[in-house]
Amino acid sequence: MTVYYCDVKFERLPLRFLTAFNPDGKVNTIRFVPVPPEKTTPPTTSVQDKIKETDIQVCTGNFKLPGTLTLPKNGKDLPVVILVHGSGASDRDETVGANKPFRDLAYGLAERGIAVIRYDKRTKVYGADSAPAGKEITFDEESVDDALSAIKLARSIPTINPERIYILGHSLG
């Protein structure tokens, strides 16, 4: 997929005009999105001292979604919260402008002894290829199937208690 964008200044806020084309050169996406912030605020040293993060991959069939497992620095037999996105193509942090609510939730929960799984949404990673060719994406394909795969992943992580897996959804999630 090829993506082009142009930042546009409006009276109240800047927006990014984004256009994506599939390999055949056909338009895949046209949308306005928030302009990414110049930089994000990293967690404070005290948070970094209490948590650890590991790259993970949530796999549903051929769809491989990059994600992050956030854990307390020490602990075993941990409960885990799986964060599920709202509508739209969202990253694992559910980034909106300078806000990263899923990242912030992950850090806060991990500081309190709860592991968190968050992952890039299928529509963020695969766009129109998220659904079978020529078909509209279903709710299961957009959210449910990947959340179920995240549960399966959580059950395979040695430090996670498989009886204490929770789902926290935002909006459509």
Language model features by range: what are they?
Residues 25, 36-37, 64, 75, ...:
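Solvent-exposed loop/turn segments at secondary-structure junctions
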Residues 32-76:
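N-terminal cap/lid segment of alpha/beta-hydrolase-fold proteins
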Residues 84-114, 118-142:
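Cap/lid segment of the alpha/beta-hydrolase catalytic domain
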Residues 78-81, 164:
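Alpha/beta-hydrolase fold active-site loops
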Residues 18-40:
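Short beta-strand edge/turn micro-motifs at domain boundaries
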Residues 1-23:
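Exposed beta-strand-loop-beta-strand "reactive/processing" segments of non-cytosolic proteins
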Residues 159-171:
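Alpha/beta-hydrolase fold nucleophile elbow
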